[in-house]
Amino acid sequence: MINTTSRRKIEHLKLCAESPVEARQVSAGFEDVTLIHRALPELNMDELDLSVDFLGKRIKAPFLIASITGGHPDTIPVNAALAAAAEELGVGIGVGSQRAAIDDPSQEDSFRVVRDEAPDAFVYGNVGAAQIRQYGVEGVEKLIEMIDADALAIHLNFLQEAVQPEGDRDATGCLDMITEICSQIKTPVIVKETGAGISREDAILFQKAGVSAIDVGGAGGTSWAGVEVYRAKESRDSVSERLGELFWDFGIPTVASLIESRVSLPLIATGGIRNGLDIAKSIALGASAASAALPFVGPSLEGKESVVRVLSCMLEEFKAAMFLCGCGNIKDLHNSPVVVTGWTREYLEQRGFNVKDLSLPGNAL
């Protein structure tokens, strides 16, 4: 029998594949970011080095296929396609929340298939902050072992939990548990927002807690509050529907969140990454890697080759952006100046950041 968590996972996958679930009136902010064009790059585009060391593992490009799904039998071919594409192109990949496999161990194969199809890739596990108090360190270690994970993402989806009728709305004690997990396990821990962004205040807390990386998961991409609107309509839950509509675009946009989160930790830029230029802008703004989920949902339902086609295009766009900025490797792009204008600049200046420093050589706030 399929449990509630497993059923919800397949509902989420279908909604993301078939319904408009992206932000409506808020943007990730990449239109406010201008890379500095070098008219004479003095580089051979075919010889650029896109590879990077990320949390102890070398990947061929600074990109991760973000957590999408798992926990239902129908998700096995989806995760297999995603993982096989990641393995072929040498990028990283995350699994969806492994909660369903804790509730029902028969669902483990829907997650384990990722490591089976991507034996050499950077693979991260995934569990919600609301669940780690229940699972404890021992339970978290089981999730890591399940997929031989290179890292574990603890996702922060309290916006979705607040909207979801069956959501877990108790966030007390999560930071202490994150701190305990970081001190007890050897595997790197990533704290991952899921669409509402990370503030400066929280980035500092996570750094003190001992996490290894922060995935900013900013507003401007998939809205999980929006996803829950469709579920609420289906169940005729008018309160949850109203909450989801109101908070559809809530949160800190991705670009602003990247700047907010610039502490001495690797950053992952997620939220509205839709092309290689977005990836390049993210790296120039300080991210160690970028990631996306929604662009691969539809292709993953078609199979590996469709995922490879979409991802290859994004990576070629990324390479072109590096070339046109005169950057031969990722370190060069990290130090490449950028100009931030518009709403994003206004927001960041009101938050106390001097964005003009980003436009200077060295690109340091």
UniProtKB/Swiss-Prot annotation:
An example of a GO molecular function for this protein is:
isopentenyl-diphosphate delta-isomerase activity
The record's annotation in Pfam families points to:
FMN_dh
Q: What is its EC number?
A: 5.3.3.2
Q: Keywords on this record?
A: Cytoplasm, Flavoprotein, FMN, Isomerase, Isoprene biosynthesis, Magnesium, Metal-binding, NADP
> What is a biological process (GO) this protein takes part in?
isoprenoid biosynthetic process
Q: Which reactions is this enzyme annotated as catalysing? A: isopentenyl diphosphate = dimethylallyl diphosphate
Is-annotated flag, keyword Heme? no
Top-rank taxon, per record: Archaea
Question: Ligase among the record's keywords?
Answer: no
What Gene3D superfamilies does the database record attribute to this sequence? Aldolase class I (3.20.20.70)
Q: Which residues bind substrate?
A: 8-9, 97-99, 160
Localization per record:
Cytoplasm
The record's comment on protein family reads: Belongs to the IPP isomerase type 2 family.
Quaternary arrangement and interactors, per the entry?
A: Homooctamer. Dimer of tetramers.
* Protein known as: Isopentenyl-diphosphate delta-isomerase
Q: Which organism is it from?
A: Methanosarcina mazei (strain ATCC BAA-159 / DSM 3647 / Goe1 / Go1 / JCM 11833 / OCM 88) (Methanosarcina frisia)
